[in-house]
């Protein structure tokens, strides 16, 4: 029998704090009864909500913290004010100390990444971590990274992301040789910024052991599922992610308006209710909520700050799956066997985003 999964929760993170986080944790607990939780935050705010869920209370332990990292705090501010004593820091520190197998937070992205880097450090051979998101596509699902950890990327960091994304796809999707594409403004080899073109040249001509390089892909290829892993720098990746989420909400809004316009439309909806329910579920961004911080010596999951309980539960589910699939071990093995010797070049700029 497998050992229980221990997940550390930043109960104060996100736009709504424990009012959303704790119901989300309860939903995840029901799906994964072999899980225990460490809840970091203001005990006076946590305990009354936790009392609504007796089974979760039994499976949890509250660790009181006095400091909450604000959603608008810059990473440098968050580190100065919240290092060692905030719910976010203590949540990550539980992973470092071996008290938890994964940390989940809906807090400020830039602050969470900064604290995770300082506390957990990056794996040997990795210059900078990346945030990987599981993306619904016409073919099923794919992985897109980076979706917001850094702005800009060197050719070396793009190659590192290709290695980490490939390892994650093999783990999560059970694919022996997942295809990897570099996001670009065109598929032609002469197009794009120099860093992307150089990374493409290395992957295409020199190769990286175990990376099944497809070539350049464009924005429309993400939703089509042309490749299993899409690699890009964090600025473009975050815009693509937010655009896709906004488009899904826009389509859902259009459908609701169209199906309630006339009695014929309402009748058509009733006749095709099951099909529309399946479509609504497919378009629901909460199902894919949660980004994995790849390249760190520990599992850290970032939930959207404005999500609801179901969305936060999906982020906890993701952390559970990463632990059960032993993602860190697989990435470490991939780095040792695949990473080419190459200069890192200039470092990208750390993202300051908070969503």
Swiss-Prot record:
Subcellular location field: Cytoplasm
Metabolic or biological pathway, per its Swiss-Prot or TrEMBL entry: Lipid metabolism; phospholipid metabolism
Coiled coil: none
TM helices/strands, residue ranges: none
Full protein name: Phosphate acyltransferase
Alphabetical list of SUPFAM superfamilies matching this protein: Isocitrate/Isopropylmalate dehydrogenase-like (SSF53659)
Similarity section: Belongs to the PlsX family.
Matching NCBIfam families: plsX
Originating organism: Azorhizobium caulinodans (strain ATCC 43989 / DSM 5975 / JCM 20966 / LMG 6465 / NBRC 14845 / NCIMB 13405 / ORS 571)
Function, in words: Catalyzes the reversible formation of acyl-phosphate (acyl-PO(4)) from acyl-[acyl-carrier-protein] (acyl-ACP). This enzyme utilizes acyl-ACP as fatty acyl donor, but not acyl-CoA.
InterPro entries the UniProt entry points to: FA_synthesis, Phospholipid_synth_PlsX-like
Catalysed reactions listed for this entry: a fatty acyl-[ACP] + phosphate = an acyl phosphate + holo-[ACP]
